Amino acid sequence: MNRLNNIILLVVFICTHAHSQQAYFVDGYHGGIYGHYPVKWKTQFIVDQLSKHPDWRICLEIEPETWDTVQIQTPGAYRQLKNVVGTKQVEFTNPTYAQPYCYNISGESIIRQFQYGIAKINKHFPGVTFTTYSVEEPCFTSCLPQILKLFGFKYAVLKCPNTCWGGYTNAYGGELVNWVGPDGTPILTVPRYACEKLEENSTWQTTAWCNEESYLNACRDAGIEHPVGMCFQDAGWKNGPWLGSGKNTKSNSVYVT
């Protein structure tokens, strides 16, 4: 009987642990008027998709000057977006003016990128706050923790699962790390996990790009209880929720910003 009880307890523990590992996913769009942002339809498409999929959450990494053109060419969609960006469905995660890679420019230039970009976004969307720095392409450099903190950011993400061809951070650590700048400033950060490998036969994509079960299992084996994947879609793509929505969301993932 004691042996049976032990087996039952073990099964309950395993089932509870498996159930407790909720998978998360960060979706969104990146691009802009000088890159890829089809002004005639994109803003209305975003608003409509958010309304159609209330469980969807997106991060916006759009060149701030884009909103000048959107306001003029599609004023109705622009007004609708203004009403949405203040909700929990949307977060601006990279307000830099031109989405620089950062590692190839000076600290002073990086500061101006944030200063000008934040001012432009606040002009169009007053009251928007900037909490988490997250990017689709590898827009990272060592001095960012200090700069981000000075602009009010609380968190950062060091993943770029779908654009590693531009560079990528080392796979390191588990669920969270403190990213420390050369001046000693730390910022709480989601890293590219040590278990987050490059996709097989790929130098431009990691396993975190679509929350496959193999990736989530690797996270579970590494002790990561709240694994997160991400993909900021090109703004030129006419695609809504990356993993599907509602009951059809891949791997039962929950969208977060």
What is the predicted role of each segment?
Residues V11-H19:
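Hydrophobic h-region of N-terminal signal peptides that target proteins for export
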Residues Q21-T257:
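Catalytic-domain carbohydrate-binding cleft regions of carbohydrate-active enzymes
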Residues N2-L10:
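Sec-dependent signal peptide recognition
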